[in-house]
């Protein structure tokens, strides 16, 4: 697997992530179970985005010093494009979490605890998936066509799909978990497990955590191949992906109260997936530069938010009228 990642870059990335996670876990432990306010969520979102951009700037500077701008510029652009793709696709993941918490009636104060462990699990699972994907691509380059076709199909499916939280409890996976886990009927404070009559029982909070992890894996199956369309370098794919998901918890609390205001977002994300799928399928006939890919993804997101704002304005006007 060819990569620009050196021991210094890998080590620096690991240290930054470890420090930020330690700070996050320390704050979680000191404050206990409580809901993150909109102000706190906005502040933490800004912290994570700023940290990601600073890392990319340091990454670019390091490559300029060691490899020159001919290498540094496209690699930094690849990181930024991958980060933007993952960050935008992660919004759909956030909406699924919102449905899970709503269906299982998880109090806002406990949602943060679930997401702390959910993000930690996502880091481990995505790291495994990214290195596996990088190895597969290095051995079988034709697998990019499979990724492209899958993203094209997923984009069309996303545009046509309709999510309904009322059917979550009837999903085969949920029924299987409930049937095979010794589980209590109600949430017991912030505990994932409790002891009753000498036996260990999982609480519904543990079920929600499992579903949060599985939902992230499902979305990673979309988002990771999407970043491979930009670059196959495992260092850039992993760092851009993890920096994007590290801010997911703050993004959730930022968007949780206004989720219904983003009705058009899934269509924009669907267009992004279709574009990336086509990019992967035509790679042998026409190479779309990274800068163009970044511009297209950014442009689609901007247009989506403009259309969404217009739709909300029309709905609000009709409601008042």
From Swiss-Prot:
What ranges are annotated Cytoplasmic (topological domains)? 28-43, 111-113, 157-198, 247-261, 308-321
- Which UniProt keyword terms apply here? Cell inner membrane, Cell membrane, Membrane, Transmembrane, Transmembrane helix
Compartments annotated for it: namely: Cell inner membrane
Record field: transmembrane: 7-27, 44-64, 90-110, 114-134, 136-156, 199-219, 226-246, 262-282, 287-307
Read off the Pfam families from this record. Answer: TerC
Task: Please indicate which superkingdom the organism of origin belongs to.
Answer: Bacteria
Where does this protein chiefly localize? membrane
Which GO cellular component term is one of those annotated? Answer: plasma membrane
Membrane topology summary: Multi-pass membrane protein
In this entry, the parts of the chain located on the Periplasmic side of the membrane are 1-6, 65-89, 135, 220-225, 283-286
Signal peptide (UniProt feature, chain positions): none
Function field: Has been proposed to be a redox modulator.
Q: Which family does it belong to?
A: Belongs to the TerC family.
* Name this protein carries in UniProt: Putative membrane-bound redox modulator Alx
